[in-house]
Amino acid sequence: MTATADKQLQRGIVQSLGLRHPKRIVMPVERPNLHYSVLPTAHVTDAILRALQKTPGKAVVFCRLRARTESLAERLNRAGIPAAAYHAGLNREERSRVVQAYLSGRIRVVTATSAFGMGVDIPDIRLILHDHLPTNMIDYVQQSGRAGRDGETAYALLLFSPADFLRFHTRCQQIRVQHKHRPFTQYALIQREWRPYRRVLRFCLQAPCLSQGISAAFGQQSAPCGNCSACRSGAIGKEIPNIPRMTVQELYCWILQLHRDELHRRNPHQKQATNAQLREIAETMQLPDNLPGRETYFPYLRAFQSHP
């Protein structure tokens, strides 16, 4: 039994267990009481603070790194929001203290890695935030689904910045270096990384309804929820005031800037050539379908091409 298994994972489970014609009971992943929003922003921490100020009750902020959980908890405490970090680097006693403080109301927010929630059932979490782009939809649905288990209205806000794309690009570059003499292996590994990541990008930027997008990721269908940021605005979420959201063109520009900085850090002699390439790309920014260098350097930008 699992709460989040798409069709591919279901096939894998059946194959691993050697089952023949098993009876499958699949329930809808749709959560009508959970309102989803996505927001690309250059000011992730500010957006987290504003979301917490706007939404009362218990909250969890999922972070990619342990160090980020610690620094963010410190930042929230300085802002007057009681918080504590939770990650696998803490011993069992320390993790238990955080959970007990959370349950008792001594802290309002847990900043956590994916380790939080395993074996912990807290029904009255009102807000789940992600300060990064998840690498696949299964992880996102598992983590965001920890909100509103009591059936009351709850919220899930996914924040992401171009630094997320740089991390993905860096991972692809590592694969290319590690398997430079095995192009077929290189291609297969990059595609394995890219496919689930692309689904998350399309969910964030192109889903007409985020709840529908989650259902579709699991091979299901649902009606528009009417409550998510896509249903309310027809575009990427705008509901947090005074946090400048990023347009798709700005995302392009920032990704390219980060890419140039990374190349220069590794080899300063490449800077001029990269600048020339960036100028050429910037001149055609209004024509993303014809973006020079996209196929060579930025294949992951393909997810943006049909977004207005």
What role is predicted for each listed range?
Residues 6, 41, 45, 193-197, ...:
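A structural signal for well-ordered alpha-helical scaffolds and beta->alpha junctions
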Residues 30, 121, 193-196, 210, ...:
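N-terminal alpha-helical segment
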Residues 120, 206, 269-273:
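Helix-turn-helix/winged-helix DNA-binding modules
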Residues 189:
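Anionic-ligand-binding alpha/beta catalytic cores of soluble enzymes and soluble regulatory domains
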